[in-house]
Amino acid sequence: MEHTWIFDLDNTLHDSQKKIFPVINHKINIYISELIKIKYIEADKLRQKYWDKYGATLEGLIKHHKVNPSKFLEETHTIENFSELIVPMPGLVKTLSSLKGKKVLYTNGPKNYTNMILKECKIEHFFDGIFSIEDSKFVPKPNEISMELFLDKYQISKAYFVDDIKENLETAKKFGLSTIWITDEVGHPSYIDKKICELSELIKN
């Protein structure tokens, strides 16, 4: 029986923290600052607050400020020199090509952004499905509603779930999935089945 692999995108398949996230966060801060007429530094704090609470800043903006999600994503994820900001994880192509079974991408990122990253990393052909924030009706991980929509769409009951955010994996474990945390953080929560520092460790055992 073939395995099913579920992969997060940002900071799992590519190092978004290094280049592209600072650009996106800056654009979000400007968007928030102009939306609710607050200083940039306060917008930055609010962006982080919503991300910590909901798993995505967008969720907080929808709940508290009635933001149009499609317009928000277009304004904050349309980026010049996009290709220069993408940093694939070491051994990305080799890892994905070596892992046997169905592979599905599950991300809080928007579809166009996701497709562009997969194309830049030359890995789009590895995936049997792509589930973006639009597919979850703009409800992000780790919300259980998002997880239910994802699992129902692809009829998944057993799979390996690879993510850098432990809260997402906690939700995945509630649905019976095997959890793999890619992180350099200390600690090993009980809902984590395997902990790795680099993506390439998936094929080293």
Which stretches of residues belong to each language-model region?
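Substrate-recognition element of Asp-dependent hydrolases with the DxDx(T/V) motif
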Residues: 71-84, 92-119, 130-133
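Hydrophobic residues in well-ordered beta-strands that form the structural core
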Residues: 15, 105-107, 181
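Conserved residues at beta->alpha junctions
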Residues: 11, 105-108, 163
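N-terminal helical cap/lid subdomain that shapes the substrate entry/recognition surface
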Residues: 2-90
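Residue-level marker of regulatory loop/turn positions in helix-turn-helix DNA-binding domains and
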Residues: 88, 106, 139
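Asp-based, Mg2+/Mn2+-dependent phosphohydrolase catalytic module
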Residues: 1-3, 97, 110-205
